[in-house]
Amino acid sequence: MKSRIIYFFSLGFLSLLISCGTSKSKHHKPDITAYNSTKPVVEKVTDSTFISGKNSFLKNKQGLWELYVEGDPLEIGLTTGALTDSLLQKQQRIFFSKITDFIPSKFQQKMLRQFLKWYNRKLYLNVPNEYQTEIYGVSQYTSNEFDNIAPQYQRSLYLHAAHDIGHALQDLALVGCSSFAAWNEKSEEGNLILARNFDFYVNDAFAENKIAAFIKPKEGFPFMMVTWPGMIGAVSGMNYEGLTVTINASKSKIPLSAKTPISILTREILQHAKTLDEAIAIAKKRKVFVSESIMVGSANDNKAILIEVSPNKMDVYDVPNSDQLICSNHFQGDAFAADKRNLEQIANSHSEYRYERMQELLSENLKVNPEIASEILRNKEGLQNIALGYGNEKALNQLLAHHGIIFKPKEKLVWVSANPYQLGEFVCYDLNAVFGENRNKIESFQSKNLNIAKDPFLETTAYQNFKKFKVEDHKIDVLLEKKEVISPEFIQNYQSLNPDYWVVYYKAGLYFYQKKEYLQAKLNFEKALTLEITTVPDKEKIEKYLKKVKRKLQ
């Protein structure tokens, strides 16, 4: 992590010396002359219901926001911004406060701002004008509070590369997702079904205002996607033709400039493709700046594929002799079979483990339906059902997902998880009904009779303890950083809240190591090593500490 931060700040310093390369991008704005730029009038019906003509924004009883917008790119952008106004400003505050927490130094923040301006200098050249225009429309409703980072439009454009930049800074753990698809003999009725967890984690507050967005553009197909205020890119979505997209990060090198953000590429596929071949053709047109697996499902083809993209090459991973497809955070196609970074990802990360766990759970279920798919997404155990501890990234359900989502493309049905994570009720939407002509009532679009109940885990003592653990885990991090005294009672309580998670013993071991209580450190490091440790580097780190401790005890 440290080396990547130093690398980025070195680039930031370099960018001060060559800032002339950023002047065009700093002042660039999309061409909106062909559009009507009149700002929409919004009527506030209640504190959680807003309308503007045919467009609406409301919060349903499960806590999900539902957005319906139609029009040309500028109309969609302006109306989205106007309807989501207060949430949009709150979301940017949450995101940028996280950056401040991560980089408290004012000098380093300044360097990061310089880096972002330099790094994103070519971003606008790689985003189609229709999406630049939409982003411009939304940006008119953002706060001026963060103009020191960049002006409204440029800042909003930068945020669409947040997934990609978080991915490049992999150690930030912003990204790590699991997805699967089943069809023919593997699904009920033989029709395609897909499901995924989107583990893009900033903090709990960031995921509070999930939006199920339903967009009817003048050009392209109507579609839905799960998003957050200010985000027009697609991370999970399905269009009216029954084509779905979801994205999973893979191992990537740090490129020297931004290209097309993955979420913009997938938005283009979602809006303009109805078959797998059309999705592939769109992907071939764009240059990306990180490595990503795009799972594309198609009702017309009744199957799913992976479009694997990187800054240098692209591959299509098909499974011609199978009726299921699994994806975590590594590439599977021939083009990347000998790729050094991909092989390292498989060997050292938790990606392969989650892949095998999905294989295991799918093999236990002869035919997948939405309820079974939700159970797989919510699964917290490891291979052969071993306890991993709650929050372990080896689990499919890491208890940090922004959302879980399930698609049945032929039926045009989609299920979106309400908070928290993927544990809340999976709310069902029927795109036939949403985009139908009879939209006279201002009410939730959900098909209530098809909803999937919330996870019973929410009512358990274990879940309540996990919530307490998150608080105590943050506390122990602060105490360790400040090298303050931690009471035996605190450590005992901390470990009891999540006893199967290796982290609670590792951090206790670190404390005792700091205090030169080497026997206690040894016992805790040894206990951690008996549990399922998330990654190979994590395990090696503990083993290194244990060697040091044993030498101290000799």
Task: Specify the residue positions occupied by each region the protein language model found.
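Extended amphipathic alpha-helical segments with heptad-repeat/coiled-coil character used for oligomerization
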Residues: 307-323
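Assembly/interface hotspot detector across virion components, adhesins/toxins, and nucleic-acid enzymes
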Residues: 3-9, 55-57, 307
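Short, surface-exposed beta-strand-loop junctions and turns on beta-sheet-rich folds
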Residues: 200-202, 252-253, 312-314, 420-424
